[in-house]
Amino acid sequence: MELLAALNLEPIFQLTFLGLIVLAGPAVVFVLAFRGGDL
């Protein structure tokens, strides 16, 4: 069970990290646009 849990957690962490990157990209653009109006 421990080996299966480790194998199953790796893709979950990778998908979570990828999701954070996908959400962080537009978030940074919106924050910069609202704060300064210039990128």
UniProtKB/Swiss-Prot annotation:
Reported biotechnological use: Addition of a 6-His tag to the C-terminus of this protein allows purification of intact photosystem II (PSII) on a Ni(2+) affinity column.
Keyword list, A-Z: Membrane, Photosynthesis, Photosystem II, Thylakoid, Transmembrane, Transmembrane helix
InterPro entries per UniProt: PSII_Ycf12_core-subunit (IPR010284)
Disruption phenotype: No visible growth phenotype or O(2) evolution during growth at 30 degrees Celsius, 50 umol photons/m(2)/s. No major changes in PSII subunits, decreased O(2) evolution at high light (3,000 umol photons/m(2)/s).
Any one biological process term the GO annotation gives: photosynthesis
Compartments reported by the entry: Cellular thylakoid membrane
Residue ranges crossing the lipid bilayer per the database entry: 10-35
UniProt keyword annotation of Protein biosynthesis present: no
Membrane topology: Single-pass membrane protein
Pfam families: PSII_Ycf12
Coarse class of the protein's main subcellular location: membrane
Cellular component terms (Gene Ontology): photosystem II; plasma membrane-derived thylakoid membrane
Biological role: A core subunit of photosystem II (PSII), probably helps stabilize the reaction center.
UniProt xrefs under HAMAP family: PSII_Psb30_Ycf12
Description of how the protein assembles with itself and partners: PSII is composed of 1 copy each of membrane proteins PsbA, PsbB, PsbC, PsbD, PsbE, PsbF, PsbH, PsbI, PsbJ, PsbK, PsbL, PsbM, PsbT, PsbX, PsbY, PsbZ, Psb30/Ycf12, peripheral proteins PsbO, CyanoQ (PsbQ), PsbU, PsbV and a large number of cofactors. It forms dimeric complexes.
Protein family membership: Belongs to the Psb30/Ycf12 family.
The protein, known as: Photosystem II reaction center protein Psb30
Species of origin: Synechocystis sp. (strain ATCC 27184 / PCC 6803 / Kazusa)
